[in-house]
Swiss-Prot record:
GO terms for cellular component: cytosol. CDD domains: DHDPR_N. The active site is at H143, K147. The gene is dapB. It comes from Clostridium perfringens (strain SM101 / Type A). This is 4-hydroxy-tetrahydrodipicolinate reductase. Pathway: Amino-acid biosynthesis; L-lysine biosynthesis via DAP pathway; (S)-tetrahydrodipicolinate from L-aspartate: step 4/4. Transmembrane segments: none annotated.
Length: 254
């Protein structure tokens, strides 16, 4: 049995993860939660801060916000247990901190836990270099009106994957305004916030005679929870410090 502490257990994703762990993952048990809202109805105890939690566990799973990062890393260092980061909105300083922390603990991070997005991300590594010379590349990401970070972590993941796959230097733009002709080396990420959109990501390769679109639409938050719980199963026995991702969980390499 994989014992999990869930940070952000009272939020939307925390609720989905808790429910799926009980109904779809017989080998995973949420043994404790961490959240400012300690009054949520859960089958496990909830603590306000990581340092208050004295429950034995195998993996610490985070579905909260970027500002929880340092306290979670310190807790994982103290307990010598793997940490899974599923939050977004990290700053450049945060990402550097994550990189350094992975030298001390097994640290898993993914901007998106869905199987589909990770397949798309790996597909882009192959497609983008083939199309770049004759196609303009644009991205559109759409999320609900309560999402606080923009562009989404997933959109940045896809954009950076495209950039890293190309031999030429490219420039990321975030939205367009004013009067200016598009430069060849631009990759623009456009953001939509509205309603209850769970998460749509579209990568557009626009050529003179044809347009190729790669789309992913999340129609349920279950897809993120399933990926996270699979990551818990994968990370439970990891003791070696290092960086891990959904590519490791899904064994993607194409």
């Amino acid at each position: 049995m994989v014992k999990v502490i869930l940070n952000g257990c009272s939020g939307k994703m925390g609720s989905v993860v808790s429910n799926l762990a009980e109904t779809k993952f017989p080998n995973v048990e949420i043994v404790a939660g961490i959240d400012n809202n300690t009054m949520a109805q859960r089958s496990y105890p909830i603590f306000a801060k990581p340092e208050d939690c004295n429950v034995s566990y195998d993996v610490l799973l985070d579905f909260s916000r970027a500002d929880a990062l340092k306290s979670l890393v310190e807790f994982s260092k103290k307990t010598k247990k793997p940490l899974i980061l599923c939050s977004t909105g990290y700053t450049a300083e945060d990402l550097k901190f994550i990189e350094e922390s992975s030298k001390e603990i097994p640290l898993f991070r993914s901007a998106n836990m869905s199987i589909g997005i990770n397949l798309v991300n790996n597909l882009l590594k192959k497609v983008a270099p083939v199309l770049y010379e004759n196609f303009d590349i644009e991205l559109v990401e759409r999320h609900h009106n309560q999402k606080v970070d923009a562009p989404s972590g997933t959109a940045l993941l896809l954009a950076h994957t495209i950039q890293d796959s190309l031999n030429e230097e490219t420039k990321l733009l975030y939205g367009r305004e004013g009067i200016a002709k598009r430069e060849k080396n631009e990759i623009c990420v456009n953001t939509v916030r509205g309603g209850g959109i769970i998460g749509d990501h579209e990568v557009i390769f626009a050529g003179d005679g044809e347009v190729i679109e790669i789309n992913h639409k999340a129609i349920s938050r279950d897809v993120f929870a399933i990926g996270a719980l699979k990551a818990c199963e994968y990370m439970a026995d990891k003791t070696k410090a290092g960086k891990y991702s959904m590519d490791d969980v899904l064994q993607l390499n194409f």
